[in-house]
Amino acid sequence: IKEHEPHVEGVAGIWVPVTGIIDYRRATEKMIEIAQGINEQSKTVLGEEVIAVEKGADANTVVGATQKFKAKHLVFCAGLQADRLARKDGVNLDEQVVGFRGDYYELTDQAKHKVKNLIYPVPNPDFPFLGVHFTRMTDGEIECGPNAVFTFKREGYGKTDFSWKDTFDALTYGGTWKLFFSNMKFGIDEYRRAFSKKLFLKTLQGLIPSLTMDDIKPGRSGVRALLLGTDGDTKDDFRIEYHGHSIHVLNAPSPAAT
């Protein structure tokens, strides 16, 4: 461990020289650029809510709030709305998407020298979350986290974000409560850490004991779309459903992105 990460404490480590990360935002922008270069008719539409999916013999039509799009083949990779769009398309789906927010901290400039690579703990197979880790980003920033807390809004990136519909759907689904009851202590600890920088730091110190309160600052948050079974089981692999002219990516676990 010390050879690669002098500030990390641990019993043993596995060095993986081929690991890496990607900037998904830049990758997506590049894909759009390439598509438009291949075909000038390629179009990117943002902010258009999908109201319905109309079935046809040879093609399907996506009905948006202001526009319609007809295509022989549709690919839905909708993340936090994947289950709802699948049902609009007529997919018979028992599982439901539940959102879990992950908060990150960043290392301050004075502490960045303490992380040289990507540092991960040994994951606990009893939980669907990896645990806090250190990630050196493509822009040189270093993220620490995330935690994992149930969010009361599917796109709830803020700690106090709330949606009646999303909360009702999640809390009236039996699988949600089975997940809660089987991971009660874990869930409570995660919520405590979400509102306490000191507790978050204590977890980070499990890997790098020399970190102090001055070494970390609040960073971004993300929401994981967790496909949850009726038995409370988390689906830890890809779930792709083929339905007529459509392909639905219902579950895209880490390190996937939507």
PLM feature spans:
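Helix-loop-beta segment of a Rossmann-like dinucleotide-binding subdomain
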Residues: K2-I38, T61, N183-I188, G244-A252
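A short, glycine/Asx- and small/polar-enriched loop/turn
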Residues: E3-V11, E54-T61, F69, L228-T234
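Helical element adjacent to the flavin cofactor pocket in flavoenzyme catalytic cores
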Residues: I14-H73, C77, R84, T258
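Flavin-dependent oxidoreductases
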Residues: V53-S163
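Short, cationic low-complexity segments
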Residues: K159-G175
